[in-house]
């Protein structure tokens, strides 16, 4: 609604993107608000958790991994991108590539299992499906959307399978068993990375400079932008890191570019720059990376690139898409056979 609190923030230039707004007509109206009513006219990103299909639903990621068919997995992401983009979505919070070996963790089904090699292959297939398979030509079409690999890093390795919990492991195990799928997504050109909630070496990932800068950018060469998970910045207050200004400054200095929901960046970074806690160079770099993603998506040339009102009826839940989903679902089936294996009494 044009008179809502969010609309007023958009007009003031305080919003860089929205998530979970569904419907191309609604998205077009909000994009128009940003482009025509804000001072700088910077277009918004519109994101959604498009995890295993949009309207045409594919097997959950754990099920897709059972196909061991990278072409089929890439096809599923491609169809999801076509449908989501037809409804105004330009950014998906996928693929989720967290390796997990503890069945007590509640999000095992969103990942691809225990094997980092398989996870890396699937990460690449999903990114290619969403963004396009040609690294030199990604995101040019209006049916290709920005991917976001998550949750960086080690989100599936929390102690005792408890969500948001601490992660304590050697570098050897970390890089041999858990990190490759994230790196593989970077190799495939993924445009954004989402930080995880857990801590590593006693430092929350959202404020972990070693993770976000030394590994992700310097070691792997990632040049996209990093976004927090939902309220990832403000949740560090409960973890004892500091007040909202302190945790926001630590996140930006660590390499976080976009604050999801916490509003710590919008509310405190000006004070942090003035007090010297954050440099203008660091703030400019974060802004530049987000703007670069919007340029790469073509939103400055055409803010309504993903707002063709005729596309939903043409491209969503089509007969061809449903047939592909049925075929890939059948390929994912795993049958267990009772072979009368001898059991030794324990």
How would you describe each model-predicted region?
Residues 1-346:
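Glycoside hydrolase catalytic-domain context in secreted enzymes
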């Amino acid at each position: 609604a044009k008179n809502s609190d969010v609309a007023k923030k958009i007009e003031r230039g305080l919003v860089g993107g929205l998530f979970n707004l569904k419907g191309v007509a609604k998205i077009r109206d909000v994009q128009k608000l940003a482009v025509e009513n804000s001072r700088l006219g910077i277009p918004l990103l519109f994101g959604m958790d498009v995890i295993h299909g949009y309207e045409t639903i594919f097997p959950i990621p754990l099920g897709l991994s059972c196909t061991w068919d990278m072409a089929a997995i890439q096809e599923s992401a491609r169809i999801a991108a076509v449908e989501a983009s037809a409804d105004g979505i330009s950014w998906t919070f996928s693929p989720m590539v967290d390796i997990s070996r503890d069945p007590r963790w509640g999000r095992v089904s969103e990942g691809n299992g225990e094997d980092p090699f398989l996870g890396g292959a699937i990460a690449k297939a999903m990114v290619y499906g969403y963004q396009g398979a040609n690294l030199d030509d990604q995101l040019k079409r209006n049916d290709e959307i920005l991917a976001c690999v998550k949750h960086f890093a080690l989100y599936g390795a929390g102690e005792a399978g408890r969500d948001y919990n601490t992660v304590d492991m050697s570098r050897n195990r970390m890089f041999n068993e858990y990190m490759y799928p994230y790196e593989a997504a970077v190799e495939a050109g993924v445009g954004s990375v989402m930080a995880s909630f857990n801590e590593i070496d006693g430092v929350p990932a959202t404020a972990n400079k070693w993770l976000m800068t030394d590994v992700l950018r310097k070691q792997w060469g990632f040049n996209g932008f990093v976004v927090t998970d939902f309220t990832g910045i403000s949740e560090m207050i409960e973890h004892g890191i500091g007040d909202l200004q302190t945790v926001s400054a630590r996140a930006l200095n660590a390499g976080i570019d976009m604050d999801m929901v916490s509003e710590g960046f919008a509310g405190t970074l000006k004070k942090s720059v003035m007090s010297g806690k954050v440099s203008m160079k660091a703030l400019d770099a974060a802004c530049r990376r987000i703007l670069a993603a919007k340029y790469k998506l073509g939103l400055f040339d055409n803010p309504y690139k993903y707002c063709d009102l005729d596309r939903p009826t043409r491209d969503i839940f089509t007969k061809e898409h449903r047939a592909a989903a049925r075929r890939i679902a059948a390929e994912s089936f795993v049958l267990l056979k009772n072979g009368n294996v001898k059991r030794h009494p324990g």
